[in-house]
Amino acid sequence: RSLCIDMINKANSGHPGMVLDGAPALYTLFTKVMNINPSLSSWQNRDRFVLASGHASSLLYALLHLSGYDLSLDDLKQFRQWQSKTPGHPEITITDGVDASSGPLGQGVPTATGMAIAEKFLAEKYNKEDCSIVDHYTYVLCGDGDMQEGVTYEASSLAGHLSLGKLIVIYDANEVTLDGPLSYSFSENVKKRYEAMNWQVIEVADGNDIQAINRALKRAKKELFKPSIIIMKTVIGYGSCNQGTNKVHGAPLGEEDGKNAKLSYGFDHDPFYVPEEVYADFKKNVKDRGTRAYKKWLKTVEEYAEKYPEEYKEYKNAIEGNYHLDITE
């Protein structure tokens, strides 16, 4: 949270609202749930993460930096600057560790649905009963604005129909839009709608409760025949004097409010300061854990290649794009 406040303040541009209320969820996801390898961000069997609400990019960048991706503290200081590695919305061709570019609200869930379809297709085509080389999840963080977009529901309907159990959406329900309270423009019962689309719906009453978020994510992972949506109640701009209002949605906190927000978190340090114990925590719980998962997967791949050489050759060519396809032939 503190890094994000500093990034947005220095740029004098950005969206702190969702960043501050969604930080506990993504901290939990990165450090306790996702299997990723910052040393090899292109690892084929890594879990995927899609930031549907791309305006909350500072939160993703802070997590990528802390996790050990090729994103320095100086890069964070260049947030939203021309030709920086930390643009206003994430771009897969610019920033190490970004799995999906973000654009207009609504596109994140469809993008993730496509990823989950690809995972399921590859798993069913190549996995064997004694050897699974494709086995990863796709996670999404979305907000109220995404739920107001029709394409989100179209993709969600397809995901439920296809039983994409490895698609997990975290819905940051802070009930505030840039224009004001969500009630001005939206009153749907999202829970009932997703239940009707064959999704598992899990509710978290407090978006600051890391233990509850962790339990919800683990429960979601166990349901392999339905996609899951975790409806998480949050307070937009948590810690700001304007928390809970649209004033904190898309404007920097400023020096005074930013400092007071940090104090409310129990963090009283200079801008962009990161304690060494924080880096150590992320190294242990993200990088080291991900490296172990990667090495375990490599052993599985070696076993698979030995037992099923033809299937492995086909899989490898498909993944690496080594096929020549000509529809005229």
Show the residue positions of the predicted features:
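Thiamine diphosphate
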Residues: 1-138, 280, 284-329
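Glycine-rich ThDP/TPP pyrophosphate-binding loop and its adjacent helix/strand module
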Residues: 38-39, 94, 100-285
